[in-house]
Design a protein with these regions (language model features):
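Bacterial N-terminal signal peptides that target proteins for export
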Residues: 1-9
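Short, composition-biased linear "edge" segments at structural boundaries
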Residues: 2-3, 17-19
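Bacterial N-terminal signal peptides
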Residues: 8-16
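Pepsin/retropepsin-fold aspartyl endopeptidases
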Residues: 21-314
Length: 314
């Protein structure tokens, strides 16, 4: 009898404990993991539901982009205006629409957006889903489920894992920037770096930072990359190893392949930020973009030990 009473009391105590409320996303959208390891989603423009488009998910893009070379985007929008575009390696004036377009991913349509047109290769993708759409939500990227979870602004932080590292987001050149520690050649630096899921790179330090700290020539590059943003001849990156990358107070990643930029035009030539984290780094984490509270949560996933470059493990 005593045993029964004790169990009943324990059960009653458990019932009285406050439970962490589960936040429900407003939508869950599957993504395709491309051969380039970047994220691709299905997007619809201006109510054309019979014309599904393959878009690159890009936290490094301020706007939504249509690929003007894709036959699938023809006639979807009228490009009657123009804007100045800062790409990774150039600054150009490109066509844009009025701010009256409708963009939908999953069930969530956002109206009043501007679209810009960039002539990517026809078979690259149909467009780029940038921040003008994404910042209407808190956004969680889950690689295990291969899904993107959209939350009402302010609800995202409730979905953050207790194991995630939280980084404070700022904005430079219109894109999110976070503080990261990096050790190069035995010297520690605290850098502000862009967060760019649209980049297939790992971790590039911008030209002004490289010059200011005299980094060129301090290591022999293991490879040279010649990048092409929206122009064909985009400049050079010297690929080297960073001793380590430090995220927050809890996570240190040793021997990360990074790069010293020598690009002289565009984002990587800008001193507005010290460098850029690309998707080849970010894919190792489930990511939660709390746009309401300007925070990025990074949770290690099962892609942590995915090779950065195949040629490095052959």
């Amino acid at each position: 009898m005593k045993k029964t009473t004790l169990l009943s009391l324990c059960f009653a105590c458990l019932l009285g404990l406050p439970l962490r409320a589960e936040v429900v996303p407003t939508d869950t959208v599957p993504f395709e993991l491309g051969a380039d390891k970047r994220l691709y989603v299905t997007v619809y423009i201006n109510g054309q539901d019979d014309r599904p488009l393959r878009f690159l998910l890009d936290t490094g893009a301020t706007d939504v982009v249509l690929n003007s070379n894709s036959p699938r985007t023809e006639g979807l929008a009228a490009f009657t205006e123009s804007v100045e575009n800062n790409s990774v390696n150039s600054v150009e004036t490109i066509p844009s629409t009025e701010s009256s377009q409708v963009v939908r991913m999953g069930s969530r349509a956002i109206s009043g957006l501007k679209l810009i047109a960039i002539p990517y290769p026809p078979d690259a993708w149909d467009g780029v889903l940038g921040l003008s759409y994404l910042r209407n939500f808190d956004v969680r990227i889950d690689y295990r489920r291969k899904s993107i979870f959209l939350y009402e602004l302010g609800d995202g932080q409730k979905a953050a894992s207790d194991k995630a590292v939280r980084l404070k987001m700022d904005y430079r050149l219109g894109v999110p920037v976070v503080p990261v520690g990096v050790r190069v050649g035995g010297v520690d630096y605290l850098v502000s770096v862009g967060v760019d899921t649209g980049s297939d790179r790992v971790f590039d330090l911008n030209t002004p930072f490289v010059r200011r700290n005299g980094l060129l020539g301090t290591q022999k590059p293991f490879a040279i990359s010649r990048i092409a943003g929206t122009v064909k001849d985009g400049g050079e990156l010297q690929n080297v190893y960073f001793d380590s990358v430090i995220l927050g107070d809890a996570l240190t990643l040793p021997r990360i392949p990074g790069a010293f930029s020598t690009v002289t035009t565009g984002v990587q030539a800008s001193d507005a930020m010290d460098g850029v984290l690309g998707n080849n780094f970010l894919q190792r984490f489930n990511q939660l973009y709390d746009f309401k509270n300007d925070s990025l949560y990074l949770e290690v996933n099962d892609r942590l030990y995915t090779p950065f470059y195949d040629f490095l493990v052959r």
